[in-house]
């Protein structure tokens, strides 16, 4: 969801990105209720590692959201999630490259239109 929230406003630009790179860090609470050696918080408290870097289960959802709402297709996308030494939270950085970069004003309008009352993008 965090990656989709970052990308959704950019659909309004009606431009197909050349490349999208999504870098996500997730806490141990997102790994589910069953403790495992790689996901249980006490065992990963001082660890930081990539999680399914080339075949993440949320990548199709991100592509589907963009394709359904934008009319264009995401053909060149990289999604890497890391398990961070956090209990809760997801931190996402999204890098979107266009052949002609949008102006700062265009970007602000897109994001404000989608999230007018939330300080999410401030």
Listing of model-derived features with the role each one plays in the protein:
Residues 1-15, 22:
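Alpha-helical support elements that line or immediately flank enzyme active sites
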Residues 18-122:
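C-terminal substrate-binding/catalytic lobe of Rossmann-fold NAD(P)-dependent oxidoreductases
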């Amino acid at each position: 969801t965090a990656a989709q929230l970052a990308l959704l406003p950019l659909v309004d630009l009606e431009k197909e990105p050349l490349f999208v790179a999504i870098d996500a860090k997730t806490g141990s609470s997102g790994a589910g209720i069953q403790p495992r050696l790689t996901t249980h918080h006490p065992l990963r408290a001082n660890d930081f590692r990539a999680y399914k870097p080339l075949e993440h289960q949320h990548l199709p959802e991100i592509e589907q959201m963009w394709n359904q709402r934008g009319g264009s297709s995401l053909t060149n996308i990289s999604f890497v999630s890391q398990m961070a030494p956090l209990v809760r939270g997801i931190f996402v950085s999204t890098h979107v490259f266009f052949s002609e970069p949008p102006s700062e004003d265009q970007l602000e309008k897109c994001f404000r239109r989608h999230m007018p009352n939330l300080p999410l993008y401030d």
